[in-house]
């Protein structure tokens, strides 16, 4: 809804590739990239670094950045739109034992953000910041019309089911592409 189904998208730090596969199955041209994980579900749709990308998705990635500003700078060389999830820290900042998102059991969450943090990052890179929910965000050069943001929030009442009927799966065409490559 916010970005066209005819665009090209990259799922960064995509893990095993399940999100890429699911998005391709409903008709979006998504590609996989992850330097730490094997692509199991979207093999054949690895990102070609010479291809244009309209937007990058990053789910549960920002909190792992050791140097967020540099990471964002590098991502913006690929696309001027980042669609991502990360929980905003509560205000006041909770003690470690009082907020599950610190991830003390695994120690992998090392960067935490507030709405103000993302507003400052947006300003630094001349982007717009859209806080869709407290855990879903967009940083983009594009101006997103306020009505589109409101419609996006309607997914809570089932709007996504209507949109889903308008999409065409890439499952069959991907099967052909994959099997043709393996001949």
Q: What kind of region is each of these model predictions?
A:
Residues 115-183:
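Rossmann-like AdoMet/SAM-dependent catalytic core
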Residues 102-105:
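Short glycine-enriched loop/turn motifs at secondary-structure junctions
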Residues 1-97, 107-125, 134-141:
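Conserved SAM-binding loop
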């Amino acid at each position: 809804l916010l970005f066209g189904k005819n665009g090209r998208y990259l799922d960064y730090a995509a893990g095993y590739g399940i999100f890429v596969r699911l998005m391709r199955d409903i008709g979006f041209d998504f590609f996989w990239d992850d330097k730490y994980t094997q692509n199991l579900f979207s093999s054949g749709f690895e990102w070609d670094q010479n291809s244009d990308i309209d937007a990058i998705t990053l789910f549960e990635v920002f909190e792992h950045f050791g140097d967020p500003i540099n990471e964002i700078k590098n991502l913006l060389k690929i696309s001027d739109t980042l669609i991502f999830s990360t929980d905003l820290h509560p205000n006041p900042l909770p003690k470690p034992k009082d907020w599950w998102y610190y991830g003390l059991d695994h120690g992998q969450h090392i960067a935490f953000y507030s709405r103000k943090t993302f507003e400052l990052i947006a300003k630094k890179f001349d982007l717009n910041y859209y806080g869709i929910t407290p855990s879903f965000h967009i940083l983009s050069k594009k101006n997103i019309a306020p009505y589109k943001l409101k419609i996006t929030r309607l997914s809570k009442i089932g709007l996504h089911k209507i949109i889903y009927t308008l999409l065409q799966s890439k499952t069959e065409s991907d099967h052909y592409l994959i099997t043709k490559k393996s001949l």
